Regions:
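Secretory-pathway lumenal glyco-enzymes, predominantly type II signal-anchor Golgi glycosyltransferases
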Residues: 1-351
Length: 351
């Protein structure tokens, strides 16, 4: 009986050992899988073309001589645009020096109003002598019929009242964020010719206008033509976990790392970089993440993004306010109001 007991226990131990060994092998195989990838030293993300040559043909000559066909959309139909796109509404013949493009969504009416009443007020910037225009960028509804008409009707009324919405004819969705980036940059390049700087920012961020302007003032003329900045990720790894929101298969991107890129929540860039990106995005294979795609194009152009310590991807503490440029995490209206009040900028941003 005792011998049978020992044999039974031994059998049980062997089963447990084999099970653990199997789990260990699977785990090691998975770790090897997610760590694989080609070094960026061999980076040739399609298309393998000279973006500077294409840029020269498009912006420096009267006729586009490029024989290379873009692989991405070059333009999007505009459903709504402000009467004064990149002019000051109260001074139609005066162009802004800084244009802020707020990436919003159709139903985010409250977020847009919160921004208009706070850091989106042009007086926040005019107080420091900088003419600014803030525009909200939207796609269209995925619904059809009466649902589309109701939502679009509200957006139409909003634009009639405020005149600060740019709406493009692609479905508003997470998978189309790269289209929103392309459309926004094309609009900026074509309509905002006098602007020196652009900001791309999500509508759940709070911005600190004085600190943003201080950052802009420190950009040298030498650095200006290649200046782009934000919360830069220096060694970002592609996510290889299936079913993850950020999953990218090797077939789409075979490299072990992404090039450095500024996180999409807040990006500050010069007009020349916006022009370069608007061209480069047409000839670069897209991934589902707009900030990663920006990094791909910058890498092809040989441009290194600048990290800004004042751009926060999480909510701030009091100790960070002095150098804060923008902060993420303020979708809730009451939270937005309390966060804005904490910055103490109401006096310079009032009408």
């Amino acid at each position: 009986m005792y011998r049978r007991y020992l044999l039974k226990n031994r059998y049980f131990d062997i089963v447990i050992f084999l099970l653990l060994l199997f789990i260990f092998v699977i785990l090691i195989s998975y770790l090897v899988y997610i760590s694989q990838g080609i070094s960026l030293n061999y980076f040739e993300h399609p298309l393998d073309v000279d973006l500077y040559m294409i840029y020269e043909n498009e912006f420096k000559t009267a006729v586009n001589k490029s024989l290379i066909k873009p692989i991405n959309p070059t333009s999007f139909h505009t459903i709504l645009s402000p009467k004064y796109s990149c002019e000051l509404p109260d001074q139609p013949n005066v162009s802004p020096e800084l244009v802020v493009f707020v990436k919003s969504a159709l139903m985010h009416f409250e977020s847009r109003n919160s921004i208009r009443k706070s850091w989106g007020n042009p007086n926040c910037f005019l107080h420091f002598g900088v003419r600014t225009r803030t525009l909200f960028v939207l796609g269209r509804s995925e619904f059809t019929g009466w649902e589309y008409s109701d939502i679009q009707g509200l957006v139409n009324e909003e634009n009639s009242k405020y005149g600060d919405i740019v709406q493009f004819d692609f479905v508003e969705s997470y998978h189309n964020v790269t289209y929103k980036l392309i459309a926004t940059l094309n609009f900026a390049v074509n309509e905002c010719s006098s602007a020196r700087f652009l900001v791309l920012i999500d509508d759940d961020f709070i911005m600190h206008p004085p600190n943003l302007l201080q950052t802009i003032s420190e950009v040298t003329e030498t650095h200006y033509p290649t200046y782009i900045a934000g919360d830069v990720l220096r060694v970002p790894r592609p996510v290889r976990i299936p079913f993850s929101k950020w999953f990218v298969p090797y077939s789409d991107y075979p490299y072990s790392l992404y090039p450095p890129f500024p996180s999409g929540g807040t990006i500050l860039l010069s007009k020349p970089v916006a022009q370069l990106l608007s061209v480069g995005l047409r000839y670069t294979k897209l991934l589902p993440f707009e900030d990663v795609v920006i990094g791909l194009v910058l890498y092809k152009l040989g441009i290194s993004p600048v990290h800004l310590d004042g751009v926060f991807s999480v909510r701030f503490s009091n100790g960070h306010i002095d150098n804060l440029i923008s902060i993420h995490g303020f979708r809730d209206h009451s939270l937005f109001r309390s966060g804005w009040n904490e910055l103490g900028l109401q006096n310079i941003c009032k009408d």
